[in-house]
Amino acid sequence: MTGRMLNKHPDIFTFNELHFYEQLWKQQDQTKKINQFEAIALLNTLFSTQRDGYFHRKADEKYSSESERLITNLNGPSFFAHEIYKAFIEYEVNKHEKKIGCEQTPRNVYYVDAILNHFSNPLFIHIVRDPRDVLLSQKNRWKRRKFSGNTVPFQQTVRQWINYHPITIGKLWLGANNKISLHKNKPYYYVFKYEDLLMNSEKEAKGICQFIGLSFHDEMTKIPNVGSSLKQDKPGQLGIDKSKIDGWKKGGLNKTEIFICQQICKTTMIENGYELEKVNPNLFLLLYYYCIFPVMGFMAVLFSFNRIKNIRETIKRRFFN
């Protein structure tokens, strides 16, 4: 939602989720160069992700001529992968006659240090949301295929269903939000609450613009209502949907899921102003969730092997760093 809002600004171009870091780049690539053919393949993949969509991306040769032209402007014959990524970002921003690129992949939160090293003066916008609403959203994420008009591949729907477990989602939320402590109060890092954006969209949008160094435009709050895991997409309906606040209170999560989430995230929740709900879990359901956790975790890793460059590094960054 924030990416679509920023894309309404005349100076900002919002990319699709490119998933460069983690899926196309690993830490070992920091010092490893690639040749021209590998660079073109990487660019083709990035072009495909942006032009065709993340679910249809591949190293499509239909973009080879464009990739080759871009490569000629770089100092070859070998390159670092992040140099290719940076060149692609700059190319697309200029192509759309914008000044600033917004790369909205959420997992970039695990690669802030790498991004700071790869780009000159990058800015980060970190959105904090009630983990119980995150849990509800992720639990229903597999329904995006239906709500988006079958634009999500069936295999992705299966993967999204497998990825859900209250322990996994709770730990991911905690890991991502604990990253705030590493960069809080730094001039390049801006944090706001998702709920504040919904309740007072213009005020929060102005705060984001001030952080970036741009003026606010009224059109920024007139965004299409799409992308929800709980509702049918309504691209013709513009504005901020305030009904997303406290969605977990309206049903969709059982008491045991809420209990697990709060047990994992409670300290960080309190620090961010989220009140804990008094709930008594179902002990049999609690035991069930803990028993199936290793199985669901293994299946989630299995379904991610062909998507992530270094699964060991990814698990370490998400859960242990």
Residue ranges and their predicted role:
Residues K139-S148, N177, S181-K184, Q210-N321:
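PAPS-dependent sulfotransferases, especially Golgi type II membrane carbohydrate sulfotransferases
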Residues F13, L123-I125, Y190-F192:
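Hydrophobic/aromatic beta-strand patches that form the interior of the parallel beta-sheet core
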Residues F15-L18, D218-M220:
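Catalytic beta-strand/loop signature of glycosyltransferases that borders the donor
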